[in-house]
Swiss-Prot record:
InterPro entries: LIMS1/2-like_LIM1, PINCH-1-4-like, PINCH-1/2-like, Znf_LIM. Disulfide bonds: none annotated. SUPFAM superfamilies: Glucocorticoid receptor-like (DNA-binding domain). It comes from Mus musculus (Mouse). This is LIM and senescent cell antigen-like-containing domain protein 1. The gene is Lims1. It is a peripheral membrane protein.
Length: 325
């Protein structure tokens, strides 16, 4: 053993070992105690903990900064298993159903209106609009189209027109707490909502050549009422400003709002002039400033120079690879 150590050399400095010197053995590799350090910061490993990547050893902090992705939910670095979903990275325990909070890592998920849902929740959401109504008078299932009276569903044949006495159909109209057949109702000159096809007794919205209940004149994308705010029309549908521009115009990558005025086009994205800034120090940038892309966001030259050397090498290599494509 003594003869073996006499001929052994330090893996880092290639120097020999003194007879009584303390030696660090890491997976068969021998080091002087002062040579067993992080490849990035050259400091000894706290509590002996290190991470190895491509033959180099790093302390936990530098390994996270250089190689570990950040969790979209908690913002912490991910060491170990990474879930890649919805264009983001997640800890397995952080990737949960948006409705019931069930962990999705091992059971799979379904995209639903921008949400990640477990299959039971997705199926319930999908089936919500497929269920049949129950008559609030006889409590039997309504197989055909229901008559909605005071926000409750009924079989139409339970009612008669308050004017002519005819048995009603699902086309009946409610006015001031009474039900009327369609011909009798139309003779009263009451406006009909373009969405629900029911009479409008209160405020009327006149738009797109039709009349609407205030709460029924909504954005075709988010279904929120306009409530007097400006709407934008396209192919017979109305959109709020945000979703009209999101679907047919420019939305700022940073603030996710409609870009009013000049658009900064950089990194294959659109930005408000006031939002285009260094993602590290928030210094405002223009296209005349020098900046680099990091995590799909701009970083000014001053902040870039403070990056660890290994990280800058990675970014340069990535930039050269993309430039050749």
């Amino acid at each position: 053993m003594a003869n073996a150590l006499a001929s052994a050399t330090c893996e880092r400095c290639k120097g020999g070992f003194a007879p009584a010197e303390k030696i660090v053995n890491s997976n068969g590799e021998l080091y002087h105690e002062q040579c067993f350090v992080c490849a990035q910061c050259f400091q000894q490993f706290p509590e002996g903990l290190f991470y190895e990547f491509e033959g180099r050893k790093y302390c936990e902090h530098d390994f996270q900064m250089l190689f570990a992705p950040c969790c979209h939910q908690c913002g912490e670095f991910i060491i170990g298993r990474v879930i890649k979903a919805m264009n983001n990275s997640w800890h397995p325990e952080c990737f949960r159903c948006d409705l019931c909070q069930e962990v999705l890592a091992d059971i799979g998920f379904v995209k639903n209106a921008g949400r990640h849902l477990c299959r039971p929740c997705h199926n319930r959401e999908k089936a919500r609009g497929l269920g049949k109504y129950i008559c609030q008078k006889c409590h039997a299932i309504i197989d055909e189209q229901p008559l909605i009276f005071k926000n409750d569903p009924y079989h139409p044949d339970h009612f008669n027109c308050a004017n002519c006495g005819k048995e009603l159909t699902a086309d009946a109209r409610e006015l001031k707490g009474e039900l009327y057949c369609l011909p009798c109702h139309d003779k009263m000159g009451v406006p009909i909502c373009g969405a629900c096809r029911r009479p409008i007794e209160g405020r009327v919205v006149n738009a797109m050549g039709k009349q609407w209940h205030v709460e029924h004149f909504v954005c075709a994308k988010c279904e929120k009422p306009f409530l007097g705010h400006r709407h934008y029309e396209r192919k017979g549908l109305a959109y709020c400003e945000t979703h009209y521009n999101q679907l047919f115009g420019d939305v700022c990558f940073h603030c996710n709002r409609v870009i009013e005025g000049d658009v900064v086009s950089a990194l294959n994205k659109a930005w408000c002039v006031s939002c285009f800034a260094c993602s590290t120090c928030n210094t405002k940038l223009t296209l005349k400033n020098k900046f680099v892309e990091f995590d799909m966001k701009p970083v000014c030259k001053k902040c870039y120079e403070k990056f660890p050397l290994e990280l800058k090498k990675r970014l340069k290599k990535l930039s050269e690879t993309l430039g050749r494509k």
